[in-house]
């Protein structure tokens, strides 16, 4: 198969190369990021399955952030943050004497990378501290915002993570300027390295937009319109100052970040109620490199400006210049009042950026200067602000907020909370005294456990009933896997808890084989109903627990078929969500369009199947050995989509053997592609030409990729049969419990 997916761009040093970038290029030293990827840019990057290793964590394995956070005096932290906000520093003076708007921007940009398609991005790990986010053009000068908070972080140390502190500081900033927030939850755990598993786009130049095709169709899973922007271009699409065209970009981008039209209007208007933009001069002429490209003496700072003092009134950030309102450090309804009070005309900032001012000199002198009390200005609007007035969908929402300030305040409070907490996961992960009591649909709510849990004797009884039900190992394993493997490590959504596999939209997903799924669920539901009806003391079993238990029963049976007596650990405590607690549109983005664990490959993928398998393993937070053992086990258990024979390298399906690895690595097999797209292959006996096996790319990669082959060789060894069973059980239980935050 020709590797028609996008190649990884590899930067080489062509200095002293006689002007020829090919014959004389010089590969980087390993400390500069050199290595095998330079020679083979399309090789699988298994390092994304070894994120944040324990040896990189300076806090050690005994440290538990949740326990440390619970000892924190949150009110005292907020007081200290509030003091920072109103103590202007000479090295980076506060606009209007208040850092609140600056800190809000930092919190917003920390959270604003989240996208619904894959659940990656967001504030949950404090990635704004690291490349590439710390050096995106849209994050210019936010390095200073984080430094302003260092005294607070230093004081409280490991009791509050940077990830939590940045979001908490955003809340305090809002509150200090008169706004009542919806609440705050801690629980974001810092990591110690950049995310290397997030696809930010195909571009290799800042602010390029190769992510579009056709009629401005944005590539999935991306949300931002250009490389290095959080959302949209404030000047309009590619700098075109067209509010209607900008509205289209806004709507698509915010939708991909889980926001509806009302939330979008509230967020833009609420954020632009505060502060100003900064464009004192042309950044191309005066601004130095971003933090990751700055010299060592800058000590992590970037964007050093040579214009004037480089700060205060001489600050250059976006290139846009001006404030939206005449009360830029107070919460009020002035954004909408000003937006609708004036007619607007296009103008240029001192840096040459497109922005808007009131026509005919209206509004002059109504907006205070950020640093000089003797100066005043007219208000400024951006092209994206005018979209809220002129787009036919946004306009009535904006007018309603203009006429109902309390509705606007409530909408902004809720949207801000959603923005800053969307990737934190379910409420079970929320920490602190300011967690809201109201349940919100986007939190994927679950009912509380309101019954006595089953005990070991009950588990034994239910296991017997499951074994006697007539359901096969394949059916039980497939159903449990389908239920649990929706989990996404990025935003902690999905998983088996809630038994949402029986609800829309999951019960209708193609990969879940709806007809077979319905039959299995009917049988398990009957077992559940009979068991629950027989209880007299309030004991119950949820269908969510029963699905997982049934999968474990099947694994135990398959192990027994292979000659091994194992017990699959099981922890009851899951509950069953209702359809009313399940937002169909929100859950639709969790649908797998490829699942190499089930040898399922939908249509329209840019990447080959083995890359999609790796991505799914990453979402499931699996290591490379766990990925390997799960694929090998699921193949021999018959968990393939539509019972496909692909990768079922065994004569005894339903037995938990290491046959997948033994037969894949058999030296007498020759593999040839059987499809034009090179997704399926036949393995023939090299001597007779007889077809032995058929396999997919998600199978053959374990013999092709050198790292995966090394792992496959472990499990194919004669002394690994028992190890394989135990390792499979451990990895299986991990997946079944990924969303059991109560067990952590």
From Swiss-Prot:
<feature type="binding site" description="axial binding residue">
    <location>
        <position position="272"/>
    </location>
    <ligand>
        <name>heme b</name>
    </ligand>
</feature>
<comment type="subunit">
    <text>Homodimer or homotetramer.</text>
</comment>
<feature type="cross-link" description="Tryptophyl-tyrosyl-methioninium (Tyr-Met) (with W-108)">
    <location>
        <begin position="231"/>
        <end position="257"/>
    </location>
</feature>
<comment type="function">
    <text>Bifunctional enzyme with both catalase and broad-spectrum peroxidase activity.</text>
</comment>
<feature type="region of interest" description="Disordered">
    <location>
        <begin position="353"/>
        <end position="372"/>
    </location>
</feature>
<dbReference type="GO" id="GO:0020037">
    <property type="term" value="F:heme binding"/>
</dbReference>
<keyword id="KW-0376">Hydrogen peroxide</keyword>
<protein>
    <recommendedName>
        <fullName>Catalase-peroxidase</fullName>
        <ecNumber>1.11.1.21</ecNumber>
    </recommendedName>
</protein>
<keyword id="KW-0408">Iron</keyword>
<feature type="active site" description="Proton acceptor">
    <location>
        <position position="109"/>
    </location>
</feature>
<feature type="site" description="Transition state stabilizer">
    <location>
        <position position="105"/>
    </location>
</feature>
<dbReference type="Pfam" id="PF00141">
    <property type="entry name" value="peroxidase"/>
</dbReference>
<keyword id="KW-0575">Peroxidase</keyword>
<dbReference type="GO" id="GO:0046872">
    <property type="term" value="F:metal ion binding"/>
</dbReference>
<keyword id="KW-0560">Oxidoreductase</keyword>
<dbReference type="GO" id="GO:0004096">
    <property type="term" value="F:catalase activity"/>
</dbReference>
<dbReference type="InterPro" id="IPR019794">
    <property type="entry name" value="Peroxidases_AS"/>
</dbReference>
<dbReference type="GO" id="GO:0070301">
    <property type="term" value="P:cellular response to hydrogen peroxide"/>
</dbReference>
<keyword id="KW-0349">Heme</keyword>
<dbReference type="GO" id="GO:0005829">
    <property type="term" value="C:cytosol"/>
</dbReference>
<dbReference type="InterPro" id="IPR000763">
    <property type="entry name" value="Catalase_peroxidase"/>
</dbReference>
<keyword id="KW-0479">Metal-binding</keyword>
<feature type="cross-link" description="Tryptophyl-tyrosyl-methioninium (Trp-Tyr) (with M-257)">
    <location>
        <begin position="108"/>
        <end position="231"/>
    </location>
</feature>
<dbReference type="InterPro" id="IPR002016">
    <property type="entry name" value="Haem_peroxidase"/>
</dbReference>
<dbReference type="GO" id="GO:0042744">
    <property type="term" value="P:hydrogen peroxide catabolic process"/>
</dbReference>
<comment type="similarity">
    <text>Belongs to the peroxidase family. Peroxidase/catalase subfamily.</text>
</comment>
<dbReference type="InterPro" id="IPR010255">
    <property type="entry name" value="Haem_peroxidase_sf"/>
</dbReference>
<dbReference type="InterPro" id="IPR019793">
    <property type="entry name" value="Peroxidases_heam-ligand_BS"/>
</dbReference>
